[in-house]
Amino acid sequence: MHNRATGMAVVVLVATLLVGDAFAATFGVTPSGSSAVFYVDTNAWADIHYVRNNQGQLNYRMGIVNGRNQYTVTGLSAGETIDYSFTYWDVSCNCARDTAWTRYTHSGTQPPPPPPDAGTDAGTPPPPTDAGTPPPGPIVPLYTTSTPLEPATVQETATAIITRVGDRVRDRHAREDMFQSYDHYLPLYFQARTHYIEIVDEVAKGGNRVTVNLHTVYPYDRPDFRAFFRGLGTVAEYFHNAQFTTVNDYLYTSSVNFNAKEGRAIRVGDRMELEVGVFLRQPVEGRFNYYSTTYLYMVGSGGVVPYDVTGSIRDSIPMPQAGWSGGRTTLSSPQSNEPDNRFLQMANNLAPVSAQAFVEGRRIHHTNFGDGSHSEPGNPALTQHQGKLGPSYVAPSCVSCHVQNGRALPPGTNTTLTNYVVKVGQSNGAADPFLGYRLQPRRTSGTPEGAARITGWTVSSGTYGDGTGFELRRPDYAFTNNTPTNYSARISPQLVGMGLLEAIPESAIAALADPNDGNGDGISGRMHQVRDPQTGVTRLGRFGWKASTATVRHQVAEALNSDLGVTTSVFPSLDCGPSQQGCAGTSTELANTELDKLTRYISLLGVPARRNLSDATALRGETLFNNAGCARCHTASLTTSAYHPHAELRGQTIRPYTDLLLHDMGAGLADNLPDGQATGAEWRTPPLWGIGLTAGVSGGEAYLHDGRARNLSEAILWHGGEGQAARNNFANMNSADRNALLAFLRSL
């Protein structure tokens, strides 16, 4: 019989505030045997931040127990230390409060109660964090200790480690490459077809079972549970096959205490691959039978891990961490032969709160804001967004430019650029009088303000150090209706990993900046300081070819405004030049709730894993990449903040190969349009993760800000300015070394 006390963990999100609380809350810690109970005497939300024995910092949303927030740390021995602080909502000021860092030393006895707004002793503060070390200058960090956090996806209790992961339904099984139907999205994917899986691992705490709970948004009809991959008879065969027990219409449970793969009791370290067979209760609109994502859970560890495969049956094994490009958001090794769908996936560690919002955000991403239609067949129009397009616009939907969420390709010559952003303005940074800040080539009625097209390519030639020839090209542009004097044509970039880039602490980027080239290495990257359009404070620019926006939300809202003509609370006024007609006024066409869904979708796209981890050529190429000086700007590894609101993005070690800084890349890549503090020659270091999948996702290759580079070699050869030395080092390599370096890039 299912024991709900240990088999179910309930996440409670408290939306109401205390009434009449005029004082800050009392907080502290009470020892209890080998445990310590941390508490905040409030029943609004509260978070604990703690460092155990000077190890890494952990951040958790506390739970309400007997009217107050509590969190218990278990397995303590006398003398162990915990440095801790709390962030909690104080209704007396309608604000969040941070408590001072305090050190607790476990003794197993109960200390005197602490006074309000104080800890048990002054103690020693924990190591500095991103929130405690602000960047130089006026930049205000996005996230600090006072940022409200969504619930963690892994929770540790006295009896279990509990993992929760949000998911969507799938057409076929993960390894069925003959069908190529695992990574794509089926009709009505946004309707009644998400759930989350809860893994309650009692083995991790000395117990003898793992309970898997399935939480749904729509009633399921006797879903199946499979665990421990077998793969002998079919590519979807498992040793453990059971039917979930129905607890209620939205909760189903099953337990495992025997590792049928090994013929023994389940134990710590077991590789437990799991899959759910989904059957929607009928009658239901559309198809009723599906499969879940395939996950690998390592018993005793907590959290699902990206997996690779081994042997002829392609059994799942934990992916080496060198392959975790996006930390735990990293996608498992693809086995369904769908190269075009690699950038469409949910983060591997998606939180339950994100699952339904993700698919609804994807629906908005694929919606035509003119007629409300969905870009994929079988999906009804989203009628609430009909008629919001324009009047001037570039494309009718997000996906029109970001096809498969990948890099766009230049269109044929003399074709209007509708998958580019053509920024315009004056040499002093002011708006173009008749165009504003964007050239919008389409209009819902009347004559468009103007259009740009590539009329041809100017080709130049050169030779590598070994005498091998190469050709480079640059686009030639022409305009209709209005010809701007200052402009910058920028092709649509890939979208994966943006949430992780937002989560990098400003202090980490500040540590990489060297605006005056103080170390004399010829690299002088600088942070782009941009204005927050919502608060007016100065932020670190992170997104766009010149790092001109600070957050994913701002980037999405700007694209909606300037590319689709859809206003939001972030940008309520349309792009409009001072002498331009028909674009004045303010409005909010897309509500914040819808903008939030779209932002969450973009933020939580899974990052593909690095591949070919044991390939000798690619590994040699990595060394050549570093030795050539490429990594001086394309920083391999960074760690995200502990304070990002989304649990999926917090505390992740990622490998984006960017420093998010502006670098002068020389006259060859320069345009004549200033962008905030960025000059025409300065460009943000673009991330390299996923770059080796470009051809499969986009159906071709195009790199750099205007798509001029037809392959990775050309992209490198265009580097000038601060990138000139690295470019020359590449050009002077022999053919074998150049190919090795390219093999490394293609493995990313």
Q: Which positions does each model-derived feature cover?
A:
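A generic structural signal for short, solvent-exposed coil/turn residues
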Residues: 16-17, 21, 30, 40, ...
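Generic marker of residues within folded, mature protein domains
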Residues: 11, 28-30, 38-40, 63, ...
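Periplasmic c-type cytochrome electron-transfer domains
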Residues: 134-748
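Generic secretory/membrane-interface signal
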Residues: 10, 14-15, 69, 73-77, ...
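Glycan-association/targeting regions that enable binding to alpha-glucans and other polysaccharides
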Residues: 21-158, 200-204, 209
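Intrinsically disordered, low-complexity peptide-like regions
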Residues: 1, 19, 81, 96, ...
